[in-house]
Amino acid sequence: MTRPLEQAVAAIVCTFQEYAGRCGDKYKICQSELKELLQKELPTWTPSEFRECDYNKFMSVLDTNKDCEVDFGEYVRSLASLCLYCHEYFKECPPEPPCPQ
C-alpha cells in the first residue's frame, strides 16, 4: 500500500510530465502549459481574475534561469515554496480535521 507522501511525489512528477513538452522541449513547461497546469491542477489557488500579465509575472518568478520555460527543478522549487507558505498559514489552525493516517 502506497503512503500519502509517496502518492504526492508521484503526483508531482506525473503532473509535470503531463503538461511538459507540448510547446517543444519535453522536459520543460512553457508559459501556455504553465497557465493550463495552474488552471486545471490548482483551480482553488489560481484566481479566476488572473490576467495574462499575471501569468507573465508568475512565469518570470518561476523561470530562474530566464530561458522562458520552467524546468523540473524550477517547478519543484515553486511547489516547495507553496508547501512552506501553506505550512506557515495552517500551523496556527486547530488540528481538525486530523491528517489521514
Swiss-Prot record:
Supply the SMART domains for this chain: S_100 (SM01394)
Q: Which positions does UniProt annotate for Ca(2+) 2 binding? A: 63, 65, 67, 69, 74
Q: Which InterPro entries match?
A: EF-hand-dom_pair, S-100_dom, S100/CaBP7/8-like_CS, S100_Ca-bd_sub
This one is known as Protein S100-A3
- Positions that bind Ca(2+) 1: 26
Top-rank taxon: Eukaryota
Main subcellular location: cytoplasm
Enumerate the PANTHER family for this protein. Answer: PROTEIN S100-A3, S100 CALCIUM-BINDING PROTEIN
Could you describe the post-translational modifications of this protein? Answer: More than half of the arginine residues undergo citrullination by PAD1 and PAD2. Arg-51 is specifically citrullinated by PAD3 and promotes tetramerization.
